[in-house]
């Protein structure tokens, strides 16, 4: 057995964490021979609920779980971390301006970034899920200057998986038969789900998605809006936000960081844009296609970008630039 790793999940009393913690504990994220010390952080009013989650994790009798620690204190939660999954954030309440939401979250993610800087290992991998995820991730990274910015990523894998499954449903294949869809930009309704480079396996052969579907108007219209608005559609139907699918996407995202991406496949994640070759301004936390090896991601280079894509990629970059500017105004005063 290897040495145990310390993994933190914040917002640990919430819906997404409830669906995620079992996957982490049973070895399907970090492997079946990797012992784990699982740290659960939430705000003080949630400690009663968190206690129940702690009891359930103990009752799962998972052989890889060496210890489970539930706390409301950052200095305990962030100590010596190998991985931090930042799920907790201030949810948007009815009638709340996006600006107010940003302000509340800048405070949270500045504090958590500072705690990472102070207590965590410098090699820690940080995955931000709490919305607005891209800007929250950038805020945390800026607040932890001695941790490499490449170690910070945010979740756009849920959008990526949604795009894959929409294509699969349309073609009557399984999601596994579809690969190399891309989510560009912000995890918001300006994101751009791009299948210009995606492939689908049909009768044992790999075919481009555009060629396989022969339905450009659907691919440039309804497909994009369905993926962009899927989160809202789930809330409308379920009266709660996506939890099971979000937890599955987080597990996919972390597993790929840990073990690398399969040969010939790339995935989408929000990462720092510095040095990209797609004309996205530097110093944004933007979703790109990446490949991962030895726990290090690299941009997928050299994909041709048509005018339709360019416009959509620029639009979401513009939104992220505005979010960043608003957040940084608050950051200096937070």
UniProtKB/Swiss-Prot annotation:
The modification Phosphoserine is found at residues 217, 241, 309, 332-333. InterPro entries: L-lactate/malate_DH, Lactate/malate_DH_C, Lactate/malate_DH_N, Lactate_DH/Glyco_Ohase_4_C, Malate_DH_AS, Malate_DH_NAD-dep_euk, Malate_DH_type2, NAD(P)-bd_dom_sf. This is Malate dehydrogenase, cytoplasmic. The modification N-acetylserine is found at residue 2. The modification Omega-N-methylarginine is found at residue 230. The gene is Mdh1. Pfam families: Ldh_1_C (PF02866), Ldh_1_N (PF00056). Belongs to the LDH/MDH superfamily. MDH type 2 family. The modification N6-acetyllysine is found at residues 118, 121, 298. The keyword Cell cycle does not apply. ISGylated. Acetylation at Lys-118 dramatically enhances enzymatic activity and promotes adipogenic differentiation. GO terms for biological process: gluconeogenesis; glyceraldehyde-3-phosphate biosynthetic process; malate metabolic process; malate-aspartate shuttle; NADP metabolic process; tricarboxylic acid cycle. It comes from Mus musculus (Mouse). It catalyses: (S)-malate + NAD(+) = oxaloacetate + NADH + H(+); (2R)-2-hydroxy-3-(4-hydroxyphenyl)propanoate + NAD(+) = 3-(4-hydroxyphenyl)pyruvate + NADH + H(+); (S)-2-hydroxyglutarate + NAD(+) = 2-oxoglutarate + NADH + H(+). The keyword Translocase does not apply. The active site is at residue 187. HAMAP family: Malate_dehydrog_2. It is found in: Cytoplasm, Cytosol. The lineage of its organism: Eukaryota, Metazoa, Chordata, Craniata, Vertebrata. GO terms for cellular component: centrosome; cytosol; mitochondrion; myelin sheath.
